[in-house]
Amino acid sequence: MSSLAVDDAERRVGDYHPNLWDDALIQSLSTPYGASPYRDVAEKLIGEIKEMFASISIEDGDDEICYFLQRLWMIDNVERLGISRHFENEIKAAMEDVYSRHWSDKGIACGRHSVVADLNSTALAFRTLRLHGYSVCSDVFKIFQDQKGEFACSADQTEGEIKGILNLLRASLIAFPGERILQEAEIFATTYLKEALPKIQGSRLSQEIEYVLEYGWLTDLPRLETRNYIEVLAEEITPYFKKPCMAVEKLLKLAKIEFNLFHSLQQTELKHLSRWWKDSGFAQLTFTRHRHVEFYTLASCIAMEPKHSAFRLGFAKLCYLGIVLDDIYDTYGKMEELELFTAAIKRWDTSTTECLPEYMKGVYMAFYDCVNEMARQAEKTQGWDTLDYARKTWEALIDAFMEEAKWISSGYVPTFQKYLDNGKVSFGYRAATLQPILTLDIPLPLHILQEIDFPSSFNDLASSILRLRGDICGYQAERSRGEQASSISCYMKDNPGSTEEDALSHVNAMIGDKIPEFNWEFMKPSKAPISSKKYAFDILRAFYHLYKYRDGFSIAKIETKKLVMRTVLDPVPM
């Protein structure tokens, strides 16, 4: 087979804005925060905070309940500040104590002599325990409802009550299927907090509420939450700690240093990624979305341990390559080229590039090298050769891309179910997740890996949620490029007479039903380590975050740019 000639005049292209992050800009970045004195201070603070964990005892509190709340407060804060990895043993011991000695299906009172359950304490304990894998029943919140099934609140909206209802909202967002009381709690708490905001506008509490109302659970990102909570905690005083100023000061100082130490590492990794992008010749591909920096941002928002460099860089490279391939199959590539490229991917032989057009050769080689390198990294941590498994994952994605290319070429609009079955694969969640997770120092034998990989419910739900949300944000732009098939158009085809509003309502309802199911798949007991499930869960949240307001992959110069600045490029003030 001879190489195909390239005729750009006959090709479709997407109307995408150019790369926002020039390589020269990235290479010029600098920061003082990688210096050893900062690391020395961090180590000292870690030791002091460990002592704080150990020093919390019944004698230090007013009573046993105060002691319990102090420990719970510490857990919640070190997690939200992004420093919990230093205190895993302390957190585990504290959680065992909280669950075995203090948790009750009647809620938690605010003092030894009180028989009235406290909403703030109960909601915080419920959320923390559930996220750590403990079995807690949402019926505990029934004691805070009146005979009509409505949540009780005062007319005054005191700061203490507002904090309690904020924690109720945070707890309600991790609902499992069928937990109607948490659905009711979410509606009540959201309404209450929106009404309370004007009364506390400008306060740190209002900043915390605004963040939770905006990002909730599924669009939150660990590093973004850390950045926000550092700003919130700077002036927050909690009633739960005997010496709150001392506790806040030490936690806040460590969080700032850790944030900026990681910021220094991010710059080093980002420079490597940008050089790879430039040296691979991707800048010459004018038809695609250059979002390598944005993908790195997502990776570093969910994998904040310094040792996980292979995860961050691998995720960024693979996702970038995935979006280049998506643009080739959806718009730029001709059908005969796509068939050749698909065959070359399946043969996994660099000699097959001879038959490809020039623009495809570089993409193929970068893809081939990256997948192989990720497999080598994974073998170091997993002890088994993951390449064939990874190749099958990518082949499935390429087949799904090819199917959609045929639909585009013929103007075909499939049934809703046929579209979704293919679209769950073509979104690329599985391909983006598999190899990066295998580079983590978390053993995942094949039989355990398949609890979060295809064809598990975990993977199916994540892929479905992302495909449906992506369609909601992108179907109009895709239609303008000649891509007729989407969950919106397919629903309308299946239901003659229905409107776009009907289709959007149906798709949003599907997502709403799937989120509690996905919460359950994430938090239910299983053989898969909760840490590996957490990374897979956070990858979904990272993608979902960019679809909160619009297609943040295609339009990356608004909210996505702000995310890059707040979590990667800008350190926190010391």
Swiss-Prot record:
Q: Which residues bind Mn(2+) 1?
A: D326, D330
Pathway(s) this gene product operates in, as recorded in its UniProt entry: Terpene metabolism; oleoresin biosynthesis
Any binding details for the cofactor?
A: Binds 3 Mn(2+) ions per subunit.
Protein name, as recorded: Alpha-farnesene synthase
Q: Name the catalysed reactions.
A: (2E,6E)-farnesyl diphosphate = (3E,6E)-alpha-farnesene + diphosphate
Alphabetical list of Gene3D superfamilies matching this protein: Farnesyl Diphosphate Synthase, Terpene synthase, N-terminal domain
Q: Where is this motif: DDXXD motif?
A: 326-330
Query: InterPro entries in the record, alphabetically?
Result: Isoprenoid_synthase_dom_sf (IPR008949), Terpene_cyclase-like_1_C (IPR034741), Terpene_cyclase_plant_C1 (IPR044814), Terpene_synth_N (IPR001906), Terpene_synth_N_sf (IPR036965), Terpene_synthase-like (IPR050148), Terpene_synthase_metal-bd (IPR005630), Terpenoid_cyclase/PrenylTrfase (IPR008930)
| Enzyme superclass (EC) | lyase
Domain of life according to the entry:
Eukaryota
Q: Which cofactor does it need?
A: Mn(2+)
UniProt-listed Pfam families:
Terpene_synth, Terpene_synth_C
Similarity comment text for this entry: Belongs to the terpene synthase family. Tpsd subfamily.
Residues annotated as binding Mn(2+) 2 are D326, D330
Q: Name one GO cellular component term.
A: cytoplasm
Q: What is its EC number?
A: 4.2.3.46
